[in-house]
């Protein structure tokens, strides 16, 4: 999520090494992750609530986290627990959900000073009439760049006006989720999907932040459409057969991310995972344990951006809560699994 001059070489090397051997995709789509995780949580005595946004973290008289207050209809419901784990991100957890007296703790202020917001994201989701074979789609992630000097083209883009930026997008990530899913054709015959991601500054859309979603006005919709049109012209060069086969297309700005996933400034990878974030002091300071007893952090902000980064954050957090090295447990599980597989 950062330009090369701000990226950690070691972290990027690990990422490249991973993708050299290919990538994984869940059969049935990303929703299968939640579908199979929720029963495990419930079997252990927990529960998963939908449409219940957390409004604040509750503290007891000693300043210890003891629960959360969630929205239910027009009212609030308090849910109490001995351990509170936040995947809402550092800024949301500390600045939105904690009361002022906890937010002012020196340890929390130190963490906030070390963190900066990641860049906002712009997404395009496309529904297509036609199968993977008909449209020439591939189960491949494409990164499309407008030039070789990634620092220069991205810095120029992010420094430009929103009108200029919308017509000169230097970086696109293009993927075809339906082509990756071996169950897709059975479930949705003759249909396909594309997802495209790029970066966009929150400031370009900030003037509409207080407007209701889907009712932000013609100027907002026109700016969003210009971004989408520019993006799709590049995608048509990659997949020319799709141009007259689009049944659905939707663009999402940083404000879309802010509304649906509560990212403070429309970021998709949490805080900025630049070199400063990966310095020893920052890594030692931003930990799963917080200055508020019984409150823990997990997810991308604790480790790295992306699904695997968030998963690492969960392992780190789980280890802290249980006071047990879950990485050792995973290593032992891998050995047992390999031993079982070798006997088949």
Report the location of each language-model feature.
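Active-site-proximal substrate-binding core of FAD-dependent oxidoreductases
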Residues: 59, 63, 323-344
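C-terminal segments that line or cap access tunnels to active or ligand-binding sites in enzymes
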Residues: 129-252
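Active-site/ligand-binding neighborhood in enzyme catalytic cores
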Residues: 1-44, 51, 259-277
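Beta-rich nucleic-acid/ligand-interaction surfaces
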Residues: 47, 52-66, 70, 251-264
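A glycine-rich dinucleotide-binding beta-alpha-beta segment and adjacent secondary-structure elements
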Residues: 1-4, 169-175, 237-304
